[in-house]
């Protein structure tokens, strides 16, 4: 990606109080997954995988906040969209109108789509495998100035993750006891009990 654009993206993300990363297809190149995990962990950047087509980040990663962006978008002040054609549904999800939005990907604006109307303050064209490394390096050069902000955000995210885990366990326990009908979380829980490390899950919908 263009170095000047990468620097601008780094500045946006490092100055943000409530940044968010949204992706769907980045994991098509498996080499990008550890790069995103490294970036998110280092700078306490929460990640939403919205309607994912691939594994983009480990489900138990401390910065993986789930699959729905709606609860986060009203408060975000910066969004990094990585290899994602539809990062949210405008009629359902309300983005903070003052948020800066950066799109990153080989075709960040999906120019072949007849209609696509998402805000964009900066478009970075390039492979996510290359651009994520560039972005981490650019953000690292600003790291000392944002340490307190990043540390505070990390603590807040850890608390939210703990609450998410407790709610998920409560829901699964309720279903297991027969007090509630099974849902997607229950199916995922059951699959997780039987799958092996090298198993491949295919979702057809």
Residue ranges and their predicted role:
Residues 23, 27-30, 122, 126, ...:
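Generic amphipathic alpha-helical segments used as scaffolds and interaction surfaces in large
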Residues 4-8, 131, 186-190:
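Well-ordered alpha-helical segments embedded in enzymatic catalytic cores
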Residues 3-4, 63, 67, 126, ...:
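Conserved phosphate-coordination/catalytic loops
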Residues 158-205:
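Active-site diphosphate/adenylate-binding microenvironment
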